[in-house]
Amino acid sequence: MASVFHYFLLVLVFLDTHAAQPFCLPGCTCSEESFGRTLQCTSVSLGKIPGNLSEEFKQVRIENSPLFEMPQGSFINMSTLEYLWLNFNNISVIHLGALEHLPELRELRLEGNKLCSVPWTAFRATPLLRVLDLKRNKIDALPELALQFLVSLTYLDLSSNRLTVVSKSVFLNWPAYQKCRQPDCGAEILSSLVVALHDNPWVCDCRLRGLVQFVKSITLPVILVNSYLICQGPLSKAGQLFHETELSACMKPQISTPSANITIRAGQNVTLRCLAQASPSPSIAWTYPLSMWREFDVLTSSTGEDTALSELAIPAAHLVDSGNYTCMASNSIGKSNLVISLHVQPAQALHAPDSLSIPSEGNAYIDLRVVKQTVHGILLEWLAVADTSKEEWFTLYIASDEAFRKEVVHIGPGINTYAVDDLLPGTKYEACLSLEGQPPHQGQCVAFVTGRDAGGLEAREHLLHVTVVLCVVLLAVPVGAYAWAAQGPCSCSKWVLRGCLHRRKAPSCTPAAPQSKDGSFREHPAVCDDGEGHIDTEGDKEKGGTEDNS
C-alpha cells in the first residue's frame, strides 16, 4: 500500500513540473539565461511573428526566417520583453504600432533585413531602448527628428545602408546627445554614445556639408565605430574621406548667357548658351513656343565644380523660330530662369537654303505630319504660321493614283487637324497643305502607305504597338492593314504623285518590328516601297508569290 502511494506521489510531482514548464515553439530552442528566459528560432519557416508567445520571455531571437513585416500589436502579451533580435529576415515594413506593449525593451536588432524606411515615431513606446541595430538594410533617408523619441539610446548602427545625404541636425536633436553636452554631464556617460555610419554611398555636395563638419569636430559623447567615412559622389569627390573634403554652402542656380538678344538671317545656324552655377549641381531644361513641333539638340556639360553649360542648337533657322527661349536651371535649393530672345529675319530670296520649309514664292511656314491611327484611317496634324497679320485659310490636297482618289479640303483659321478616312489597303497616298489659292510646295507634303490586309483580329492587334524606323512610322489601319508615313518632305518638284511613285529606285525602308502587348518583338512582313507604286512584303515571298520588278 505504501509503495502504491509513493508511486502516485511521484506521478503528481512529474505532472506538476511539466505543467509549470513554459511553452516553446516547435523547431525553436528555449533556455534560461542570467537575465531570464530566452526563445531562439533560427532558420524556422515562420511567416509571421507568433501571437502566442509567453510573457515570461526576456529575449526573443528569430533569425534567418521568411518574416516580411512587423505588424501592429505583434507583442501584445510580452510587456516584459527586453531583447528583440530579428536579424537576417525579409522584413521590409515596420508598422507604426509594431512596438506597442514593449515598455521594457532595451535592444532591437534588425540587421540584414530589407527596410527602406523606419517609423521613427514608433519608438515613443520604447523609452528604455538603448541599442538600435539597423545595419545592412536599404534605408536611404533620416529625418531631422528621427532620434527625437530615442531618449535612452546609446548605440545606433546605420552602416551598410543607402544613405547619401544626412543633416547634422539628426544628431544635434538627439536627446541623449543634448543631455551629455551639458556641463555637468559625467565622464561615465560621455563615452556611451556610439554611432556607425560607414559603408553608405555618401554624396559629398553642399547638402552634406553640415554632417561633414560634425564628423570632423566629433568628440565625446559621440564615438564613431569607423571614422573613415568615404564619399561616393559626385565624381570630383569620389574616394575622398570626410576629413579631406571641403564643401561649399548650398545656393540656388545663378544663370548667365553670352548674349540674351540674338538676331540672325533665316537659314543660318545658331546656338543658344546658358551657363548655370549652383550647389548642388543644377539640372537645365529649355522651353520655347514651338517646342511641341520643333525639337532641337541640347548638349549639357559640366565646365567645373557646381557649374553646368547648356547649349541649344538650331540648324537652318526659320522665321517661325523667332521668339523667347527660356533656360531653366534648378536644384534642391531652388530654380532660376533666363530668357534669350531670338530674332530671325528673312533671307534674300536668291540665297535661301534648300532646307528652308518656307518657299520663296510663299509666305507661310507649314509642318504637316501623320500623328496617329483613327478608327477608319489616319489623323493629320499641322503647324501653319502665315507671314501676315490676317487670318489665313489653307487648302489640304489628298490624292492617290492607285485609288483614283483626289480630294481638296478648304481649312479655316484655327483648325490644325484632319481625319483621312476610308483608306484602301496596299495603297500609297499623299497629303499636301498650302495657303488658300496656292499650289502645294516642297516641304509641305507627307506620303503614307497602307499595308496589305493583315487578316483577323489577332493580326491587327499585333500592329497596335510599333517601332519607328528612321523616318518611317508604322500605323495600324482598318481591316488589318498598316501604313508607314514618311515624316520628311516629299522630293517631288510638282504636286503630282506620278513623279514620286513611278520613279525607279531601290527599296527605301528597312524591316520594322511591331511590338506585341508584352513588349516582345514578333516577326512581321516588312513594308517597302519598290519605286513602282506597289507594296512588296516579305510575307509574299513566304507564300511563294513573286512580283515582276522588270
Swiss-Prot record:
LRR repeat coordinates: 80-103, 104-125, 128-149, 152-173
Domain Fibronectin type-III: 361-451
Matching InterPro entries: Cys-rich_flank_reg_C (IPR000483), FN3_dom (IPR003961), Ig-like_dom (IPR007110), Ig-like_dom_sf (IPR036179), Ig-like_fold (IPR013783), Ig_sub (IPR003599), Ig_sub2 (IPR003598), Leu-rich_rpt (IPR001611)
Localization: Membrane
Record field: compositional bias (Basic and acidic residues): 519-550
Signal peptide: 1-19
PROSITE patterns in UniProt: IG_LIKE (PS50835), LRR (PS51450)
Domain LRRCT, chain residue ranges per copy: 200-252
SUPFAM superfamilies from the UniProt entry: Immunoglobulin, L domain-like
Protein name, UniProt field: Leucine-rich repeat, immunoglobulin-like domain and transmembrane domain-containing protein 2
Protein species of origin: Homo sapiens
Phylogenetic lineage: Eukaryota, Metazoa, Chordata, Craniata, Vertebrata
